[in-house]
């Protein structure tokens, strides 16, 4: 059922390799029976992430689009989001009953943020393998995203990372804003991300016709 004010648009950002596309894939597969979904990915010169989602069967191919940003991918989600806004508009035209649009940014750094014109909610994904100092470094993704996902917690023993330190630093940097510790390879923590989206985004589940 379409939302009165249009679909919930969720921006998913984070450094390369942190698990953004994996999260997109899992969210699509878990939620597609309850919501009408579309997925938009951003890459600089390719459509690799969109092609991955198609190969994985995340959604039907007509519900997945890849945006080639060229140059700086951060501009395409912030200062000049016109390409992504056009992609969202195209999806809404094709699927008037859309409930949810997931928008994955290109290779981000800690300073990347989504324009409020493009995303209603933002999720920022970091991974333990990059080091347990990442939450303490701050940056808009760490401090201002609606939900911070600390992924690949299973790798902590292998890279000498302290999950306790990451939790303490995340709480200190984010204040009351929530964060989730995950191992998306095993879907651990996915339920908490979905619960956040449904509660914060005001989604109301209804069965989706096949």
UniProtKB/Swiss-Prot annotation:
The keyword Transmembrane does not apply. GO terms for molecular function: GTP binding; GTPase activity; nickel cation binding. It is found in: Cytoplasm. Its main location: cytoplasm. GTP binds at residues 14-21. InterPro entries: CobW/HypB/UreG_nucleotide-bd, P-loop_NTPase, UreG. The keyword Lipoprotein does not apply. It comes from the Bacteria. Belongs to the SIMIBI class G3E GTPase family. UreG subfamily. Homodimer. UreD, UreF and UreG form a complex that acts as a GTP-hydrolysis-dependent molecular chaperone, activating the urease apoprotein by helping to assemble the nickel containing metallocenter of UreC. The UreE protein probably delivers the nickel. Facilitates the functional incorporation of the urease nickel metallocenter. This process requires GTP hydrolysis, probably effectuated by UreG. This is Urease accessory protein UreG. It comes from Rhodopseudomonas palustris (strain BisA53). The lineage of its organism: Bacteria, Pseudomonadati, Pseudomonadota, Alphaproteobacteria, Hyphomicrobiales. The gene is ureG.
